[in-house]
Regions:
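Flexible, small-/acidic-enriched active-site or ligand-binding loops
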Residues: 177, 245-291
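Short linear loop/turn motifs
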Residues: 172-182, 219-227, 288-297
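Aromatic-enriched alpha-helical interface/lid elements that frame and gate functional surfaces
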Residues: 136-212, 216
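Helix N-cap/coil-helix junction residues
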Residues: 11, 167-170, 231, 284-285
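Active-site-adjacent "lid/gating" segments in soluble enzymes
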Residues: 5-148, 152-153
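Conserved beta-strand edge residues that scaffold enzyme active sites
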Residues: 4, 30-32, 223-224, 293
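A glycine-rich dinucleotide-binding beta-alpha-beta segment and adjacent secondary-structure elements
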Residues: 211-265
C-alpha cells in the first residue's frame, strides 16, 4: 500500500507509533520514498522490466519475456521478512522499534546486479552482464533420450567433469586451465560439454557424473513433481483442511528448525477472517472493534 493511502486511512507509521512507541512497522512499495517515482503504482511485471530482468532474458534467448512467476513480489516479500527479523532482533537488544520500507525496484536491482554488474564494478559501462550466466550454452544438456543439469565451479571439479565425459585432453588446454580463462571462453567449453553429453543416455550421464562426485540432476517436469519419489519420501507436499475447499495440497515449510519445527497450521484465511483478531492484538478495544465490523457490514 502506498504511503499516501496509509496516511489517509490513519494507519501510517507516525500515527501507530503514538499508540505503540516500539512498533516495528514494515511496508513495501514500488519505489524508494521521497524519490522522483515515489507514489507511482507498480506490479511485478513492471518491476521485472525496470530492473533489467526482462532484458537479461532477451539477452539469452532473443525474446523479451517475463520470468514465469511473480519473482519480484516473492523476493521483495522475502527481503521484507528478513528485514523484520533483523528489526525484531534489534528491538530485543535496544528496546526500540523502527520503520522498515522495502522498495521493489531497488530490491530487484540489487538482486539482479549482484550477479550482472560485472564490468560495472569499475564504473559506468555498457559491458554489464555475467558472461557465464548469459552463455547460450548455459542450458540443460541433451542426452540421447533426455536432458541433464550439471555444473562445475572449481578447477578440480572441471577436471573431474572433463574426465567423466572423455575429454581429459581439455584439462591442459590454455583456454580452460584457470577460472579467469574459463570465464572468457565459457561458451566454447560448454559447447564441448553439450557435444559429449549428447553421446550418453540420461542414466549413463547420471552414473558418470555421480562417480565423479559432481553436482547433477534431472530436468523435472512441473506436473511430475507431486508424484516425485524423493518429495514423497520427505513429505514435501502436505494436505490441510480448508473450510471452503475441504482438502487442499500445499508445500511444507522448506526450512528445518531443530528447536522450533515449522508447520503449516491452517489454510489461507478467507476475506476478513482474522480482522477482529488483528485489531484486538493491535490494542484496539473490543467495543471499537465491534463498531468497525458493524459499520463494514
Amino acid at each position: 500500500m502506498r504511503q499516501a493511502a496509509t496516511e489517509r486511512l490513519g494507519i501510517g507509521y507516525k500515527n501507530l507509533r503514538k499508540a505503540a512507541p516500539n512498533i516495528i512497522y514494515a511496508s513495501a512499495t514500488g519505489y524508494r520514498r521521497n524519490s522522483p517515482k515515489d507514489g507511482r503504482p507498480a506490479y511485478d511485471d513492471v518491476i521485472q522490466g525496470e530492473s533489467g530482468l526482462v532484458d537479461l532474458i532477451d539477452k539469452t534467448n532473443g525474446e523479451a519475456r517475463f520470468v514465469p512467476m511473480p519473482i519480484s513480489d516473492k523476493f521483495c516479500g522475502h527481503t521484507l521478512a528478513s528485514a523484520i527479523g533483523m528489526a525484531l532482533f534489534s528491538r530485543e537488544k535496544t528496546g526500540k522499534g523502527q520503520e522498515i520500507h522495502v522498495p521493489m525496484l531497488e530490491t530487484m536491482l540489487a538482486f539482479n546486479l549482484t550477479t550482472h554488474l560485472w564490468e560495472g564494478t569499475k564504473g559506468p559501462t555498457n559491458d554489464l552482464g555475467y558472461p557465464r550466466a548469459l552463455s547460450p550454452y548455459r542450458i540443460p544438456y541433451k542426452t540421447k533420450d533426455g536432458m541433464v543439469c550439471v555444473l562445475a565451479h572449481t578447477d578440480e571439479q572441471w577436471h573431474r567433469l572433463l574426465r567423466a565425459i572423455g575429454r581429459s585432453d581439455l584439462i591442459e588446454d590454455a583456454r580452460f586451465t584457470k577460472l579467469s580463462e574459463r570465464a572468457q571462453n565459457i561458451a566454447t567449453l560448454q559447447s564441448y560439454l553439450a557435444e559429449e553429453l549428447a553421446k550418453f543416455t540420461t542414466e549413463e550421464a547420471f552414473r558418470k557424473l555421480d562417480e565423479a562426485d559432481l553436482p547433477n540432476g534431472p530436468v523435472a517436469k512441473l506436473d511430475e513433481l507431486m508424484i516425485d519419489p524423493y518429495l514423497q519420501e520427505t513429505n514435501f507436499f502436505q494436505k490441510i483442511d480448508d473450510p471452503h475447499e475441504n482438502i487442499v495440497f500445499t508445500t511444507a515449510p522448506p526450512v528445518d528448525f531443530s528447536g522450533t519445527p515449522a508447520t503449516v497450521r491452517s489454510a489461507a484465511p478467507a476475506l476478513g477472517q482474522h480482522s477482529e483478531e488483528i485489531l484486538l492484538s493491535a490494542g484496539i478495544s473490543k467495543n471499537i472493534v465491534n463498531k468497525i465490523i458493524n459499520k463494514g457490514r
